């Protein structure tokens, strides 16, 4: 567990700040602030067990849900993404995008994104390393899926990379990773 606020950067200009976990009658949620430069955003992905919300503070948010046309949100507008809905977002404006938001329930989103951003930053390519992606996306497959990764990669390449990565010590950094949340 981190001390809050907990700030992470992915090396491409995207900055997430985890503000803490808020408990209320509807359940726990992780509160987050987001900063992203123009044209930066998340690839198409799905949170299997979480609802997510983003409120635009400054800039222009681009959002596309699975099978839908892109839409946009401007300052003061909130977008709520139901669990299980594939989506991607990006800064669709010409200035920095600033959003506040939450993920409910928190599950392992903070750990997952911290490890993913660290891998992206270390790699310097805007993408996580192959071994890190194989480990994180396999471990937390009950919680999140990156929809742009072909099924053949998940079913053929990841199973080859996992034991190889273990032999090479690539996953030592994940030894204290929390257990994945399984659907109830």
For the regions a language model picked out, list residue spans one by one.
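Jelly-roll (double-stranded beta-helix
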Residues: 1-29, 41-50, 63-184
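Short amphipathic
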Residues: 31-35
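Structured binding elements
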Residues: 54
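A cytosolic small-molecule/anion-sensing beta-strand core signal
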Residues: 57-58
């Amino acid at each position: 567990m981190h001390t809050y606020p907990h700030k992470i950067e992915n090396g491409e200009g995207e900055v997430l700040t985890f503000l803490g976990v808020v408990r209320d009658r509807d359940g726990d949620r992780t509160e987050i602030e987001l900063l992203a430069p123009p044209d930066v955003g998340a690839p198409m992905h799905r949170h299997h067990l979480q609802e997510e919300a983003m409120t635009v503070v400054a800039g222009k948010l681009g959002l596309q849900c699975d099978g839908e046309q892109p839409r946009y949100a401007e300052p003061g507008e909130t977008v709520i993404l139901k669990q299980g809905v594939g989506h991607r977002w990006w800064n669709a404006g010409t200035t920095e995008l600033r959003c506040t938001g939450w993920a409910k329930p928190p599950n392992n989103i903070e750990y997952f994104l911290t490890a993913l951003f660290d891998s992206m930053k270390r790699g310097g390519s805007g993408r996580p390393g192959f071994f890190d992606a194989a480990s994180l996306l396999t471990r937390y497959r009950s919680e999140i899926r990156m929809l742009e990764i072909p099924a053949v990669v998940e079913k053929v390449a990841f199973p080859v990379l996992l034991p190889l990565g273990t032999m090479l010590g690539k996953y030592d950094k994940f030894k204290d990773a929390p257990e994945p949340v399984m659907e109830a």
